Every structure is written in structure tokens, then in C-alpha cells.
């Protein structure tokens, strides 16, 4: 949660390693404050979508981090009810990624073990790109709903 001076966590990463080697590790990334963020799976065996690197010192509609920042600020300003609405807006997408990430991690592990690292990398790259597109779409929908309520 925000400190009195307005500071918050800039991002979070949770590494879900696999002791038995049956799947790849799943790295769950949350941009901005963990209490307001959606966590999405990333795999180092694939290529991250370039849009995730868009940032800068000021707000940009093209930046996922700034979108998460705006959602966080909306939630903090709106209090517990608004935070709950934002979480509910994310829930189906979050639940879907919780369900699909580990299947992808297992499938990619099998492909790599069978010698098809390139195909595994492409599959994971495509998976992360699809998730990122969905995250940006849903996040923008939540923000545009907030803008409509205030106008």
C-alpha cells in the first residue's frame, strides 16, 4: 500500500520453480503495487513482448507500466470498493492465466527435452504475446470505465 509520502512498490516478481523438473519455472510478474496488480506468467525460454519495455518518465498510453500505475492510483483514490471493482475486472483473466501457465510450462519442458527448443520458445513467445494483448485490452477497458464514471 502507498506510504505516507506516496511511494509504492514499482513491480513484483514471484518465481515458481520446479524441483522435479517436470515443467519449466513460471515467473509471475506484477507491474506496480502488488495489492492492485494482475500477475502474468513469463518464461525466460521465450521472448517477452516488446510492448512490456515501453516506459518513460511520464504517463504514456502505450506503456503497460503506466496503465498499471493509473489503475493503482484509481484504486487507491477510490478506496476498498474501487479496489474490489478493479480486482473483479481482472479476475477472469487472472484465473485463466493461473489455469494455462502450468500446462504451458509442462508442454514446453517436454518439447525442450525432446530437442525442440525453437518450437518451445515460439510457443511461449506467442503465449506471452496473447496474454499481454489481453492484459492491455482489459486494463484499458477498466480505465475507460473509470473515465466514463467521472465524466
Would you name each region that the model predicts?
Residues 1-151:
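C-terminus-biased signal that marks the final domain/tail of proteins
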Amino acid at each position: 500500500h502507498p506510504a505516507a509520502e506516496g511511494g509504492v512498490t514499482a513491480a513484483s516478481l514471484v518465481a515458481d520453480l520446479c524441483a522435479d523438473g517436470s515443467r519449466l519455472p513460471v515467473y509471475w510478474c506484477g507491474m506496480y503495487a502488488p495489492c492492485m496488480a494482475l500477475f502474468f506468467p513469463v518464461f525466460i525460454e521465450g521472448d517477452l513482448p516488446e510492448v512490456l519495455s515501453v516506459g518513460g518518465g511520464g504517463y504514456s498510453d502505450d506503456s503497460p507500466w503506466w496503465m498499471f500505475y493509473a489503475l493503482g492510483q484509481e484504486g487507491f483514490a477510490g478506496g476498498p470498493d474501487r479496489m474490489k471493482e478493479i480486482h473483479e475486472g481482472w479476475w477472469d483473466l487472472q484465473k485463466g492465466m493461473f489455469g494455462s501457465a502450468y500446462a504451458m510450462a509442462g508442454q514446453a519442458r517436454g518439447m525442450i527435452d525432446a530437442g525442440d527448443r525453437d518450437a518451445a520458445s515460439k510457443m511461449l513467445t506467442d503465449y506471452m504475446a496473447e496474454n499481454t494483448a489481453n492484459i492491455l485490452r482489459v486494463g484499458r477497458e477498466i480505465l475507460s470505465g473509470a473515465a466514463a464514471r467521472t465524466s
